[in-house]
Amino acid sequence: MNFNNVFRWHLPFLFLMLMTFRAAAADTLLILGDSLSAGYRMAANAAWPALLNDKWQSRASVVNGSISGDTSQQGLSRLPALLKQHQPRWVLVELGGNDGLRGFQPQQTEQTLRTILQTIKAANAQPLLMQIRLPANYGRRYNEAFSAIYPKLAKEFDIPLLPFFMEEVYLKPQWMQDDGIHPNRDAQPFIADWMATRLAPLVKHDSSNS
């Protein structure tokens, strides 16, 4: 057997396999969030990003970079290492809720989120932004100023703005933890399905991005 001929015959196939593997490896969706995505008081594999990853095995690898209690500034401080480690193609930003709950100035949160989006773009990844809303008892003026951050940034960066999934969860008291803030384990499959529907048109493969 002429091994040189065999090697030459298989080389294009091996190259194609390598490029396919590299492309697949690059198709990662990173979730940069707080306790709403981290799976507060539950195992990590029960949280909605893990369920979405199970559902999306052929579409994208979902990496949950969320940490309970994170403010937008804390998310920003972790972002460069996450981008370097996972080299995601898309990054969903679900941050700001803890800023609002702690009474941070909306302008401060806006600027931090702006820096997050700039950092993602600089890493050649596609940022996706989630609308965040606060409980009504934080006052109309503060709530309006806070909520306005997200559509403003989405327009500024020309990026998708996803609805706040918790607005659906709040309608089902049986899906809420005792603190009235966090979704419980029973809510996670619904959130995963809800997010899958809204992310599917955004997290897709095309030849222009290959």
Indicate where each model-derived feature is located.
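Alpha-helical cap/lid subdomain in secreted, periplasmic
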Residues: F3-N5, L76-S210
